[in-house]
């Protein structure tokens, strides 16, 4: 999806239609659309030909995008969880793993990257009633596997704003919440993590429309992607005006939230009350 979005931006920037792009590599406009949506594999030669058509001559830029094409054709670790991973979320997991900066605002639950196993199990069991124990175990395992990027050599930076409501919404009982609060405190002390709490005391704010995540790919010099999850699907926004608006909203949320130390103090206070 990362490569497809970049190919679409390059095509649109030079005013070439999908029909014309498809003609140049002997495929239909529908096939070009599928490529740009990240819903098909990429032939390296096709990507090279499209880059030439789009006027991309810089060797470093071409190499980066061709490397992305090769990577996109490799089965990611998350394919092992295809039985519990819908296609619309598999795209997010792929992007999350490639991001160098993940910024998020959460209003209902702790973000999946920050959840303990017990908290994840409680959230999944509550939100997806009727699942078998095996399916719940698989979904928890997937969530824990995603978190391995936080331990990797190239761990992304995390900028997190949690609405205080997240911390008061009990999931799994007292012991589970104690473990989750302690985990957030420990995460907040990492050098690559900036965690802030939007307190109840602050009224209307820029995040009233709901949770969202902004993924940045500084290593690849690619545009940011905004992820907005829905009940049975998700929005992936990468157009400049959309990304800019969400970026401004997150900046306002950060300015209006408690600072990192005050947020840690609030987490400690809530932990002591459990």
What is each PLM-predicted segment?
Residues 26, 44-48, 225-229:
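Short acidic (Asp/Glu) and glycine-rich catalytic loops that position anionic groups and cofactors
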Residues 16, 27, 193:
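Short glycine/serine/threonine/alanine-rich loop segments
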Residues 154, 161, 171-274:
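C-terminal regulatory/effector modules of DNA-binding transcriptional regulators
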Residues 1-9, 13, 18-23, 37, ...:
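Interdomain hinge/linker segments and adjacent boundary elements that couple functional modules
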